[in-house]
């Protein structure tokens, strides 16, 4: 077998890599190139898109979320977006009226908003610039179940939209509605939240409840997860792209 002594070279020559460690010389085979299958590459790309979009939407909804630092919630939310994207291209998106995994997604609490707030509200898309939430007249003590000595309920509606291709937050809005917890009729309410969601965007609307009750004679917002609710009540994906 031929031998070469006093070789003073480092780097790659053909399929071999030459290098020194201390005063010793070594050679090893260069690693082969790994080529991703098209489906694997698409999934990897979409996972990155979902991660960026998830963060952008969470940032936009932050004031409505019970705990923005919940790592499990963050992972579940981005994972739900990634699962929906699957092998789709953001340039040719498709999506049902309500995206499975995202619609009714729980940001906090034990019960979805629609189960905790039993008034038959509706969420309508007015245009590419706004949404409208309508709540008919209701009696608070009959459509919500609060802890003992509940004084009032803080109801929040929030919306955020993002550009999926670049994961940029486009717009976000929040409305807080303080409702006395009693047997008096609350008149019908309509909330209009401006939120542009142009072609190529994903928009998420959430509903949330927190109960304000007496604790040792002092009004405090309940921290019991049984009386906290924040979940997705509407998803909208605008699939049409100019020139597409």
Pin down the residues of each PLM region.
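Hydrophobic, glycine-enriched assembly/anchoring segments
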Residues: 3, 10-12, 221-244
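Charged linear interaction tracts used for macromolecular binding and regulation
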Residues: 85-230
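Long, polar/Ser/Thr-enriched low-complexity segments
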Residues: 1-113, 243
